[in-house]
């Protein structure tokens, strides 16, 4: 969500090096968390970044269930990025510990600085039923989805708008259904390395099922420890439909160039 602010920070740090070296640091993090929305930007080609954290949902009065949403990202080209989502659940009310449904996606930025769409990208993804329905860690369905992403900078405030559609595979003999998601996410610098994010998001029912629509508000600070490391924490408060309130905390860390790490590993083995 604060990718724009971080790119600006990287440019400021690079300014004394001269005009020819004002390109953003390839290790500058591109945080997609903590918001539900993602942005249109991508990790630098050949670089590896991981996002992880803990989220506690208030399942019952006095009880919370905890999960660790984790996303691994690899920059493929200047405009494409491979995502691997591997959620992990801790034992709690209505769920056992274990790995949830794994998903793979490819973010492809199609436009830069468009007059209407801003930085525009598409993110097709597939979710596999690797979790357990019985243990409460998975849906038991194979899902296909695509997210349209429009990112803007409005006088230093970053705005990310997402619209997603998912075709939910039928479980056993049941028919497939459809799911949608909308998000409007905002981020702005507060002071120094401290920024703040705020987001509205919702899941309207479109398939005629009895599943109620939901909507919620997310907000909290983020702190850029270094160009390659960003921290976040905050709250999620529902205002429509049946969904739990939640607290979260997490980290985004760019681990650097995959090729460079491979070369270092080879050198260490040959010594």
Task: Write out the residue ranges for each language-model feature.
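N-terminal secretory signal peptides that target proteins for export/translocation
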Residues: 1-4
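Bacterial N-terminal signal peptides
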Residues: 7-16
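Transmembrane beta-barrel domains of Gram-negative outer membranes and organellar outer membranes
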Residues: 20-271
């Amino acid at each position: 969500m604060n990718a724009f602010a971080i790119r600006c920070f990287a440019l400021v740090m690079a300014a004394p090096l001269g005009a020819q070296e004002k390109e953003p640091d390839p290790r500058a993090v591109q945080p997609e968390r903590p918001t539900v929305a993602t942005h249109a930007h991508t990790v630098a080609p050949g670089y590896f970044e991981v996002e992880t954290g803990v989220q506690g949902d208030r399942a019952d009065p006095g009880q919370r269930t905890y999960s660790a949403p984790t996303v691994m990202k690899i920059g493929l080209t200047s405009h494409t990025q491979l995502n691997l989502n591997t959620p992990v659940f801790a034992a709690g009310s209505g769920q056992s510990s274990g790995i949830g449904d794994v998903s793979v996606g490819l973010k492809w930025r199609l436009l830069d600085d468009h007059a209407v769409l801003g930085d525009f990208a598409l993110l097709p993804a597939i979710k596999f039923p690797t979790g357990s329905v019985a243990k409460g860690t998975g849906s038991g369905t194979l899902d296909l989805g695509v997210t349209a992403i429009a990112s803007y900078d409005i006088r230093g405030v970053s705005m990310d708008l997402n619209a997603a559609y998912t075709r939910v595979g039928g479980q056993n003999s049941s028919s497939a259904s459809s799911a949608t998601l909308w998000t409007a996410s905002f981020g702005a610098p507060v002071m120094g390395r401290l920024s703040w994010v705020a987001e509205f998001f919702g899941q309207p029912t479109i398939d005629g099922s009895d599943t109620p629509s939901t909507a919620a508000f997310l907000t909290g600070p983020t702190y850029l420890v270094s160009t390659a490391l960003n921290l976040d924490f905050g709250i999620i408060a529902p205002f429509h439909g049946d969904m739990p309130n939640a607290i979260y905390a997490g980290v985004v860390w760019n681990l650097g160039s995959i090729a460079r790490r491979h070369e270092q590993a080879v050198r260490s083995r040959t010594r």
